[in-house]
Structures are given as structure tokens and as C-alpha cells.
Amino acid sequence: MFRVSNFMVGLANTLVMLVGASAIGYSIYMFVHQGVTDCESAIRIPLLTTGLILFLVSLLGVIGSCFKENLAMVSYLIILFGGIVALMIFSIFLFFVTNKGAGRVVSGRGYKEYRTVDFSTWLNGFVGGKRWVGIRSCLAEANVCDDLSDGRVSQIADAFYHKNLSPIQSGCCKPPSDCNFEFRNATFWIPPSKNETAVAENGDCGTWSNVQTELCFNCNACKAGVLANIREKWRNLLVFNICLLILLITVYSCGCCARRNNRTARKSDSV
């Protein structure tokens, strides 16, 4: 008789196979499609690799549970156990490297501002050296500051100051508040006539440009905004990993039962 545990493992892995096949299909689409941007193309190989791993491991689970192939099931359980351990280690690592990096509240502003020193050294490596050149071009390509240039809010200083900006918009689309620039519109600011102290304390004051393709994309504040965005995504990933761990442990337990069912079925068939 086909056991419940075999059915659960087979069903779960069939669904994961579909996810893996979708990832493979989308990555192939990005390889052959000419309209994909450089930023989007950066995820092609990781997406293809992840899709292949999910598909092949799940295929082992389906073969082992549905066709009662004990070797396939044992191989699947070994890989799954290794994945659970690796995911646990990765989740603990994520918790510690994203523990720092909360934005700084600015008096009279509806947005926060960020500094690279507030983030872990490991996270700062994401925006260091040549990596930043690629990220900066992606930000310009994505037109992250265009939303600030539209509407009445972009023309009124008080309305802009109370706007809830994203970390990237706060760091890349305006000068830091301590530079004391004069607001003209959301992406055009006039430096004060005497700002030597602010420039000395914050190098971003001299880096700001009213050229719309540059703005503060070369500022450390922009790097910090990107780091804040990465930190937020990784904190969300941490929550996802915890849920995934619960699911994988459940599937692993069902897999162990399915393996025992396979052995029992083989003994019954041999009698």
C-alpha cells in the first residue's frame, strides 16, 4: 500500500521541481533575450544554478518516494540533511551580519539617513572597489530618482522633507542633511556660500552634483542606502529561511518514514 509519507514527499518534491523548472526557464529566457538589462543579467547564472539544484534534488526525492527506489531516497535524504545544516549555518550568519545598520533619524525629516560605518564590515564589501561601479550604473539604469522629480511634492521643500524616502532615494538622490544645501526641487540643490565645515566633516557635500545622471551616486551616503536596502532584503530572507527550515525538517522526517516504507515493501515483495 502506498503510504502517506511517500505521498507527502512525492507531492512536496513535485512542487519544488516545478519551481526549479521555472527558474531554469526564466534564466534561459534571460540568456537569449536581448532586451534584458545588465543588472538583470547578473542574476542569470545564480538563478540557473539554483534551478538546476532544486530540480535534480527534487527528482531524486520523487524517484525515491513514488518508485520506491531506496538508493535514490537515501541519496536524497543525505543531500537534504546537508542542505538543512547549511541553511541553519547561513541563517545564523545572516542574523549577525545584518544585526547592525539601522538608519539615523534626522530632526524634522520624514526619512532616515544612512552611513556606511553603521553596517558590518562584511556587508560593506558589497559596495567596495569595482563592485560599486557596476551597482552605480544599475542605479542610474533603474532611474531610482525619477519618482522624486514628479508631482507637487518635488517642488515644495516642506512637503519633500516630510516625504518617506526609500534608503536608496535618501542616500543617492539628495545631499546629506548636514551639508545644509538649499532646496530648489527634489533633485536640484544649491550649496551654501560658506560650507567649509560641512565639507570637511562630510565628503559627500563636495561630491553632490546637480547633473541629473550623477546626483549623489558617487557619495558614501548612496553606498549606505544600497547597504540598507541589501540589509532589509537579507532580513526578509532570514525570515524566509526560518520558514523553509521548518518545511525542510518536516519533509526530511517524512522522507525517513518513506525510506522505511520502501525497505518494508521490498521485504514484503521478496517473501
UniProtKB/Swiss-Prot annotation:
Keywords: Glycoprotein, Membrane, Transmembrane, Transmembrane helix. Residues 29-44, 98-236 are extracellular. The chain crosses the membrane at residues 8-28, 45-65, 77-97, 237-257. It is found in: Membrane. Coiled coil: none annotated. Glycans are attached at N185, N195. Residues 1-7, 66-76, 258-271 are cytoplasmic. It comes from the Eukaryota. May be involved in the regulation of cell differentiation. This is Tetraspanin-11. It comes from Arabidopsis thaliana (Mouse-ear cress).
